[in-house]
C-alpha cells in the first residue's frame, strides 16, 4: 500500500484555490478512480497521466489507484492538475526516492501532460502562482513555456520543466536508459528554442493624425482625465473610430496592481503572450457588432471565461456602430458599468471578474448615415431613426457621461492637417489632472472622478456651493437630467476643474459639463 500527496491550484474566476491531490495505491484489480468533483477535463487526465507515465516506464500491474482532490466540495476545472496527479501517482507507486514525500507535499505543480510525458502550459498560470505564493507554498513547478509568466509574481520560487521524467530523476526515481535518452532529447530540443524575453509593444496611433474635430478632441481629453464614458455620433468617415482608437495613447500606464489583474484576466482567457511581459498599457477591446452576450460579458461551457468587458478592465471597451449590437448585449453592460464587476452564473459554477472599463460608443446619426453630412440628404423616416436607436436603452445612455457630435471635416481643416496636438502633449495634461484628483480624493476609496459616489459629491465634502446646486436643480426640474445625470455632471465638472488645476468648482465648470452631458445629438 502506498500513499502520496501533492498540491495543485484550481481557479474560480481569478481566485485560486489550493487543491490537495492524494493518491492511494493498493494491490487489487487494476483501476484508476478519480474523486473530488472533477470536471470533464480533469476526468480525462487519467488517460493522459496513464500514457505519460508509461513513457517513463511506469506500468500499472495489478494495482488499484484512487486519487482524491480535496476539498471535495470544490469543483476542479482545467488540465492544469495533470502534473500534480502524475507526481502523486508516482509517489503512491513508490517510484520516487524516500526524500520525495516531504518535497511533494510542499510543492504546487501546474501543467498539462502530453502523451509522451512532455509538460505544457495552461490558461491562468499567473493567478494560480499568485494563489500558491499567498498560501505560503515553497516552490511552484510549471512548464518551461510558462516560466516567464510565473516569474511575474513577486516572491515566487519557480522551477520549469519540459518533461515529467525530469521530475522523476530530481526526486530520486530511476529511468531506463532508453527513457532517459528520450527525456534528454525532448529537454535539449526545447532548450534550443529562443528564450522568452519581453518585447516592446507596438507604438500606439497618435492623436496628431486626427484632422479637425476640436470639440471631439476636447471630449476625448476630458474622458481620459476622469475615466468618463463617451459617445460619439456623426456621419461615416468623420473620424469617430480614429478618435476612439487614439484614446489609449493619452491614458496613463497601469499601476502595478492593475497591471497584474489585467494580465491575470488575459492569462485566464488564454490570450496572454508572455513575450510581452506584464501588461502595463490600458487594454483596448473592440468587439464586432455581431458578438454574442457570452463573448462580450463572458461565459462558455463549464466554468465561465472572461469576456470583453473583463478583458477591457482598466482600459477601454469600444463599440463601433453601437446601435447595430443586439439589445440584449447592450443591456448586459449596465451591471458592470455601475459596479465594475461582472458575475456569470452557469450550471458548472459561478465566476466573478473585474470589469471596470471605460465605455466608448460610436454611432451614425441615422441608418443611412447621411444626416448631418455636408451636402448629403438623409433618406430615413423618423420611424426608422427611432428604431435605429431603440437598442440603446435609456438606462444605458443615462450611464454615458459625454455625448459629442463628430461633424464632417471641412476643407480648412484638411488644409491644416498635422497641426493638431500630439498624444504626448495631451497625455501630459491628463496625467496632471489625474494627480490633482488623487490628491483631492486622498483618504477615500476612489481614484478617478468617474468612480466617486453621488452622495459624496452632493454631500458636505463634495465642494458643491448653493449657486452650483441651484443650477443643477433647475436642469433636473426641466427634465434635462435624471438624478444619476446630476451626479455624472458633477463628476465631469470636477474633471474640468482638475484639467484647469483649480481646487474649487465654478459655474463655468458646471455649464461646460452640462453641455457635454446634454448635447443635442443624444438620441
Residue ranges and their predicted role:
Residues 1-231, 235, 241, 345, ...:
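Peripheral, non-AAA+ core regions of ATP-driven protein-machinery
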Residues 35-46, 61, 68-78, 304, ...:
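Basic, amphipathic alpha-helical bundle interface domains used for macromolecular binding and assembly
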Residues 60-63, 103-104, 136, 154-155, ...:
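Short loop/turn elements that form and flank the Walker-type P-loop nucleotide-binding site
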Residues 138, 228-229, 313-317, 339-342, ...:
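Loop/turn-to-beta-strand initiation segments
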Residues 221, 277, 282-283, 294-317, ...:
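Conserved alpha-helical scaffold flanking the Walker A/P-loop in AAA+ ATPase domains
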Residues 232-273, 339:
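Walker A/P-loop
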Residues 234, 298, 321:
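The Walker A (P-loop) glycine that initiates the GxxxxGKT/S ATP-binding motif of P-loop NTPases
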Residues 314, 320-321, 332:
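Walker B catalytic acidic pair
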